[in-house]
Amino acid sequence: MAFYRITYNEKYNFATLHNWGCTFHCPFCSYKLRSGKDGRPGFAEPKPVAFLSVEEQKECLLKLKPEKVFFMGGEPTVAKELPEMVQFCKETLKAQTKLGHTNGSNLDIPFLDGANIGFKAWSEDLHLQITGRPKSLIYNNFSSAFDKGLTLAANMVFIPKLVDLDELEGLCSYLSKLSKDIPFHIMGYIPVPGLPYLRPTDQEIQVATQLALSYLNNVKSSHLTTKEALDLTARDDRFNVKIVAGV
């Protein structure tokens, strides 16, 4: 797909390019909080009526001159212009470049400084069931990016009775063998329409956090309600952005 929107946070001087579309089909995708049980995972609704040209993206960013540029939305690496835009942001704007969130399908992008990877599962069968893609692709990409010196962070949605403590522990053990200092975020599952899984309790989040801390040094967790997830600006002023290009 392509980028259809650029937002800007003046306080922290960063811009975000928003993509439409994804390569995974995770049934618990948070996009379903807005699109409903029949919504397509990773695809924002409604579909953008137009996409930004590369020239429009560059013109907008040249005016802003942000210190950091994030690429997000569904799975940002499916945007065909991503490599060109990452290079432009690094060479022309001298900005830090980061995949604000990604499923890890493609981290071999020249001029990319860092990425925040959302791992879906540890066990091979569950990973394939959730995403439709093999686990090895994502984990090998992460290891390779780490070896190349990218600044990486990781996260996992904790879903009791699906992506449970055994999945969390497998991932944390893997990360710790690369570096115990990789930032790791446990996201408490937010129930989406059409699935039977429950939001974890406060105690379950605490147990999951302590388990992760037995492997990693930099662990955080979030336990949002549906209302909080749909309005992140109330909790974090980094989400106070304005649309500067696109719709």
What are these regions (language model features)?
Residues 37, 41-51, 70, 74, ...:
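Short flexible/disordered coil segments
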Residues 53-55:
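Residues that define the transmembrane beta-barrel architecture of outer-membrane proteins
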Residues 58-199:
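Conserved AdoMet/S-adenosylmethionine-binding subsite of the radical SAM
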Residues 1-51:
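Canonical Radical SAM [4Fe-4S] cluster-binding loop centered on the CxxxCxxC motif
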Residues 19, 119, 223:
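Pocket-edge structural micro-motifs
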Residues 17-18, 26-29, 71, 115, ...:
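Generic structural hydrophobic/aromatic packing signal, biased to beta-strands
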Residues 17, 96-103, 218-222:
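Short, hydrophobic beta-strand segments that form beta-sheet elements in well-ordered domains
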Residues 1-14, 62-66, 160-247:
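Auxiliary Fe-S-binding modules of radical SAM enzymes
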